[in-house]
Amino acid sequence: MVFSSNYEFYADISNRVMNVLSDLCPEIDIYSIDEAFLDLRTFRKNIDLVNFAYDCKKRIKDWIGVPVSIGIAPTKTLAKLANKVAKDDPRFDGVVILSEPRIIRHFLKSMPIEKIWGIGRKLTAKLENIDIKTAYDLSQVDSRLIGDNFNVVLERTVRELKGQSCITLPVSYTHLTLPTRSYV
């Protein structure tokens, strides 16, 4: 079966969504055609993150007709994990906010290692062989030890899981994904 893509259509939808987001928060890093990170550090003390997230969702749905999911967390890696749960688990109504250490710890304990951004099948197998099975397990390992035995990318991931923002993109608190199926 062969499907045709309409890149101009996707780009138009993406541009409209990114414009809405940039109106809500000028610090935006467009990661891909369907993902963006917003830097909410300047707003963190001034806004309610729950209201902000639902306002983003509502505006994008009302103005553009596209459903989105939002993950808010101290680092990009944590935000992507939060976003994945927001998208996949209907109990969260498309929004997951990881703002307290206790909540983050609980969240990481329930997250299988293969769900982490950048960890594929081969790396999952290697980590499971040394008894690292969850995001929490990985977050408890010394990041330098991981860097010495694996690579700098995984070392950064460990630091991000610990709440230390170190991905080369600007520090962000919100991760948004547009479900591809909603474009069709």
What positions do the PLM features span?
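Residues that scaffold the ATP/ADP-binding catalytic core of kinase and kinase-like folds
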Residues: 81, 107, 149
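Hydrophobic pocket-lining residues within nucleotide cofactor-binding pockets
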Residues: 40-43, 178, 184
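A short, charged helix-loop
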Residues: 93-110
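Structure-specific DNA junction-binding interface
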Residues: 1-91, 143, 155, 163-170
